[in-house]
Structures are given as structure tokens and as C-alpha cells.
Amino acid sequence: MTKKLTAAVIGVGMIGRLHAMAYWQNARTALVGVVDADFEKAKSVAQEFETRAYRSLAELISSEHPEVLSIAVREDVRYEIAIEAAKSGANLLLEKPLAPNLAEADSLLDEIEKISLNKKHTVNFVLRADQRYAEIKQRIDQGALGEICTVFARRRGTSAGADIYGPWTNLLISTAIHDLDAIMWTTGATIERVYAESVVKKCAQWNHEDAVVATLKLSNGAIATLETSWVLPPNYHSPLEAQFDVVGTGGNARITGSNQGVEIFSESGYLLPELSSWPIHQGKLSGALRNSIDNFIDCVYFDRMPLITLTEARNAQSVVAALQESLKTGQATNVDLRKRIDK
């Protein structure tokens, strides 16, 4: 049997644990360790997926020398960890966003490029691995929709999102960034100018927004509308309400919801289960997250380009920065796009 890639995960909260599960279940990887600031959590995940728990990244690197590393810690504590991981020579899969702000994202990319430009580094934008969005991109690339004129992207969560994520991140950088990247990726255009308005309620205590609606001007002449919020009540029938709609001179493509057509009616109420991102059935992880991690493994294994480069991830974050500037000034804002070398 061909040698497996050794893999490890730094940060095993909700998403990091799923990274560990994906490596454990992939036939091309051997999960050799996990790290978390909460060592008891690390031990629990290690036991679940038959690997070893480490107290620090340095200890993990020294003992295991992993070839691929998922970095799933919060973006506000990621910088030094990512640099240390890059210096180890591993190929990196970073959770999105790259950093809490654009300046730190640029600095991180500069450092990673100096250290290990020849490695396969990528960022986990799961919509690129969602077959529904990939289908729309393919149709656009084939010209089936003609010239793209408008795009509408919606991503609504409940107010539980504000409670969980509000103290350390914000709606635009954690949630809207998915759709910003999806708009650019599917259409093959960049977002050049933005104008945004917001509603601030519960998130006022953390100095950011509960809801944002924005107009985006694309480099191909199209106009996009973004709607995102953490407003719906916690008992809402769907944990995530997403929509993506593209209109062109030759047709229309549309994604509605994330429940894959499944509706549940029971004594407890009505539910649209989230079945697109990371569903688990019979102990097996599937969905866009599994696809994204499997793609990263294949990129390293077969020497292919990743689904998203660090530059593209950075440019999605640059749109977030422009939206934040527009909210602050009340004016339309140009997006600071940069070209970088990604190999």
C-alpha cells in the first residue's frame, strides 16, 4: 500500500474535531496527533479518533513531524501558530478567515511565502467544495447562463451565532466572507466596489453588526447583493438559511436552503436540517467540509493546486475590509485587491 500522509490538527473545538474525523476517515492520511489549549478536550478527541494528544504544537512537531496540518484555532490567536506550523515544513489547511483583519492577513501571507512558498497551503472556504456551488460555477464557465448581470447571496443565522461568536469575531468576517468568495469564484470576477448598511442590536456590546445588506460591483460589470445576519430566534426551524441566485442573459441558477430537500415534521415542531456543510450519518462525515479536506489531501498527495489559494482567501478578506470601511463612512468603498505568487 502507498505510504499515507501524516496529518494533525491544531485546535479541536467543533470544527477542528471534524477536521480530525476527516483525516481519520481518509484512506490517504494517518492522523498522528491533535493539539488544543484545553488538554482534556485534546485527549477526548484523540481517544475518539485513535491518535495522540499533545499540549503544544512544538511538542507535536518534534514527535510526529506531520506532513499536513489543519489550523482550526480562532483567527485572533492564529498568527504565531500558523508561522510556527509553516516553519515545520508541513502543508497547511487554515480555517477561514486568515486573520482578524486585513493587515494581519497580509503579514501572515508575507511570512508564509518567505518560509514555504513551495508547499500546498490553502484556506477552508467550504462553499468551493459544495457541489451545488460547483455546479453553478461550471454552468457559468460553460456559458450556459450567458453574461452574468446580477447575483444575490443570503446567509442568515440565528441570534445564537451572536452569543457564540460575537465576543471574539464578527458577522462579516466569520459568515458573510463565505458568500463574498462564492460570488467571485462562481462568476470568475472580482468585487471592486461595495456599499453597505447595517443594523446593530445585540452585537452592540461587541462593537459590530447583527445584520448587513450590501451592494457589490463586480469587475465583469455585474451587480451583487449580499444579505447576512445573526437575528433569527434560536428556535428557528433552520440553523442556517442560505440562498444563492445568479441571473444572466442566458438563464438563471439558484440554490435555496441547506437542507437538501429534507423537511422534518414531528411533535417537537418543524425542522429543516443542515445537510450541506458537515452532516454525519452512521459515524461518517460528509458534505462540503469533508470534500474540502479531502481535496486538500489530494492536492498534497498528487501535487495539484488547491481549491483556493492564499491570495484568493486574502482577497475575500479585502472585500470584508471594504464593507467595514463603507459601514464606518457611509460611502461606497473600493476594494484593495492584490496579486500574489501562489504555487
What are these regions (language model features)?
Residues N124-Q131, S159-Y195, N207-D210, E312-A313:
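Mid-domain beta-loop-alpha active-site segment that forms a flexible
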